[in-house]
Amino acid sequence: MEENATNILGQEFSDFLSSKLNQQFKFLSIHRIFGGASRETYRVKLQDEEKKSQNFIYRRTQDSSLIETDQKTEYVAYSDFQDTEVPVPKLIVLEESSDKLGAPFLVMEELSGVVASPFDKEAYNPYQAEIGEQFWKILGKIASRDLGSSNLNKLLPNKNKNDCCTKELNYWVNVIRKDSIGIEPILEAAIRELFRSKPLPASRLSIVHGDYRNGNFLFEGKHVTGILDWEMAHIGDPLEDLGWALSEIWCWEKKETPAYLIPRKEALGIWTQESQIEKDEDSLLW
């Protein structure tokens, strides 16, 4: 969007929120936050009736994106962790219609903190230990969230512990083949190996973030202030999140410290203690 069109969108957003929350906001500014694969994300600054400014995060569905996800799933996943020890933004509203602002969207309050590049091995220096402990502890808390009261569990189709890996593998194989412009021999070889070497059934069904890693959380000093990007959340095997967060993709320059935080053994110990889940190493590798 050009600057003028973006400012018009910001004013329309202000008008919408004023009506929705029954208070008068004044539009101050709007800025695009780049980097997401599935949403247009904006920071919108508004002034309330008491002349106090407040930043809102406005996540808007795109016509095309690298990853096709349902915005309601993202919103509901956030809702499962409101006012818990898993730090997430406070939700304001989900609008599933395109009638209001031209596309479905969700609105959240902005959290303090910054997001680091997942490829910067010094991003968390000198607080790798403190941030690392929180990072793996929070992932354990996500895995241990009770599904009985989970809104996400009520929203999504039921899974069972025996078919978690098959359903996820089939989903991503379909995405890869749909988006490929031709045969991908290396990917097809990897797919065949994954089908041949399926892991054990999940020891527990849990909320799975879907993209839990460095680069997808906010931090300020030595504190993790927010877990972001829940658009791929689902119910499944918690080892999926654990394996992805441990992946050498996110620590290729210092492979002994996953996510460029703390040593692997220490990370696994924190996660296991918090989640109370016994992990099978072969399944984790898968």
What are these regions (language model features)?
Residues I207-H209, N214:
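Catalytic-loop of the protein kinase fold
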Residues L228-A233:
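Activation of the activation-loop gatekeeper triad in protein kinase-fold domains
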Residues M1-F25:
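Juxta-kinase regulatory segment immediately upstream of eukaryotic protein kinase catalytic domains
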Residues E240-E278:
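Active-site activation/catalytic loop segments of kinase-like enzymes and analogous catalytic loops
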Residues F25-H31:
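Conserved N-terminal boundary motif of the eukaryotic protein kinase catalytic domain
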Residues E278-W286:
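All-alpha amphipathic helical-bundle segments outside canonical DNA-binding/catalytic cores
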Residues H31-A189, E193, S197-S206:
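ATP-binding pocket architecture of kinase catalytic cores
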